[in-house]
Amino acid sequence: MPTMIKISISEVTVYGELSDTLCGQAVAKVLPIDARANVWGDEFYFTIPLTMSLDETSTTSIKVGDIGFWPPGNALAIFFGPTPMSTGSDPVPASEVNLVGKIIGDATVLRKAKGTSRIRIEETMKRKESEARSERL
């Protein structure tokens, strides 16, 4: 079962989920994460206390809203738009990442948090309200 997460960066909060993969659940085990966020185009990335190798989910084919683990830097990456390596609107990581999760809803709102240095990711039982509302209908 995926792990629901809350991502807070400055005044911006989004919800997401970490997948049921080995790497996704390894990330879930190190929550909560408080880190200094780096920015690379429309991507936040930051080191977390986890060492993993590339796995069966590893790819450079990323979509807006994907969350990846980048083994060379022991870093988590949150993609919310094009990166410097992009040729279109999809993000492109510097090298392969393990897909470990995704943002629920509009990840592009994270653009409002650019210039902020701190990020917090924690487990939550709550889903983004609009998602919960659509499930009730």
What are these regions (language model features)?
Residues 127-137:
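Short, basic, low-complexity termini and linkers enriched in Ser/Thr/Gly/Pro
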Residues 19-23, 30-128:
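Glycine-rich active-site loops that engage anionic ligands at enzyme catalytic sites
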